[in-house]
């Protein structure tokens, strides 16, 4: 178990190390990541389950209550990158869940990763799921916009275009792999290409009304 988590953190650190703009993970972030990942490792996944997989945006919602479905399970972790999802998939894959909803990529953007690379890593994750869980329905959701006018995220400054490029690359992955693409981006973006101010208090994470928009967008795929 400890070795798996160390490998997971190493994978995230490896991406960080090669990116000139990459932030260092704080000790508290690493501790939270380990707590969350080891917790998930001990929680069973069943064939009837619906998995919400992602980063802080996913982590921030009570999905089973939001979607009115006790089989919906949250597997989001603050700060995670796409490679991090890949490295911690084993407990999910063992359970052969009915559906997996993925939303990830903005932390990769903040680490200096380009759109095409985001698409490649996401495709690796999707191929893994398809190979190990051939009956699982996969739903890939687009990255959301962010808004550095609300709060300055210096590692995201002037990188709005990478979100657009990454979404385009991931949509092509969905076409190649035959999985469902859910484009959330237009629902959250304002006329200036930024996350709508009324949906956030820090320019990146969602307030309650934002989660209601997200819920409504995926409702027909969940139920």
Q: Where in the sequence are the language-model features?
A:
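Second-shell loop/turn segments in exported
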Residues: 74-75, 107-115, 156-157, 200-204
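Charged helix-capping and loop-helix junction motifs
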Residues: 115-125, 163-166
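A short helix->loop->beta-strand "cap" motif at the edges of active sites that frequently abuts
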Residues: 133-137
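Extracellular/periplasmic catalytic domains that process cell-envelope and extracellular macromolecules
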Residues: 43-47, 66-67, 94-95, 132, ...
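N-terminal secretory targeting modules
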Residues: 1-51, 59, 63, 223
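Acidic/histidine-rich helix-loop elements
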Residues: 23-27, 69-82, 110, 203
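Catalytic His-Asp segment of secreted/periplasmic serine-dependent ester chemistry enzymes
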Residues: 145-223
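Oxyanion-hole/transition-state-stabilizing segment in secreted/luminal serine hydrolases
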Residues: 53, 58-71, 82-120, 139, ...
